[in-house]
């Protein structure tokens, strides 16, 4: 584990944070800082790149929903459909990481880094057809992503049930 300093975390979106960690990317997990993990989900090394998914409680909030074809993530859409969505944890093989690294320069323009609607996941999303990305669905009792005070309180209730 290595902690990296992002001196521009207040100014730029997390694409810049990803850029700061690019030398550590590959055969590695990426865990967004707003994810709470209740159980050890890191048992065994995945054979392919994958996104961890959860099914959140029904709401009108839009989430990143993977479109799955033949056990692989074919596309990712933003929707409030009640379906499994990206959790904020992923694993990337060395070969897929190298392909993503080849595209990061396209995302380093200041106007892109200042766009709060973009995330580092936008990079692999653009080249999913060139990647081998599977998925692993978890229970909300395994991990949860916190984006609001309401979700924080919900996560506390989940933790007390574990």
Where are these regions (language model features)?
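Conserved alpha/beta core of the MobA/IspD/sugar-nucleotide pyrophosphorylase nucleotidyltransferase superfamily
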Residues: 85-162
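A structural micro-motif
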Residues: 1, 26, 71, 131-133
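Conserved core of the sugar-phosphate nucleotidyltransferase
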Residues: 38-114
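Solvent-exposed, flexible loop/coil residues
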Residues: 13, 19, 41, 80, ...
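Residues that form or immediately flank small-molecule/cofactor binding pockets and catalytic motifs
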Residues: 8, 81, 140
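Conserved beta-loop-beta/alpha segment of the NTase-like Rossmann-fold superfamily
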Residues: 1-64
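Short, motif-level signal for alpha-helix interfacial/capping segments enriched in acidic residues
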Residues: 10-12, 71-72, 126-128
């Amino acid at each position: 584990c290595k902690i990296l300093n992002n001196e521009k975390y207040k100014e730029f979106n997390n694409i810049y944070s990803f850029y700061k960690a690019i030398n550590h990317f590959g055969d590695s997990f990426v865990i967004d800082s707003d994810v709470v993990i209740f159980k050890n989900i890191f048992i065994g090394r995945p054979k392919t790149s994958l996104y961890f998914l959860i099914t959140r409680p029904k709401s009108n909030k839009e989430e990143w929903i993977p479109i799955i074809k033949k056990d692989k993530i074919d596309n990712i859409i933003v929707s409030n459909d009640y379906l499994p969505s990206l959790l904020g944890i992923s694993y990337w093989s060395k070969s897929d990481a190298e392909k993503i690294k080849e595209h990061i320069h396209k995302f380093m323009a200041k106007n892109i880094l200042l766009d709060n609607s973009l995330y580092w996941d936008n990079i692999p999303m653009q080249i999913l057809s060139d990647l081998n990305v599977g998925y692993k669905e978890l229970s909300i009792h395994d991990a949860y992503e916190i984006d609001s005070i309401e979700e924080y309180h919900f996560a506390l209730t989940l933790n007390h049930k574990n």
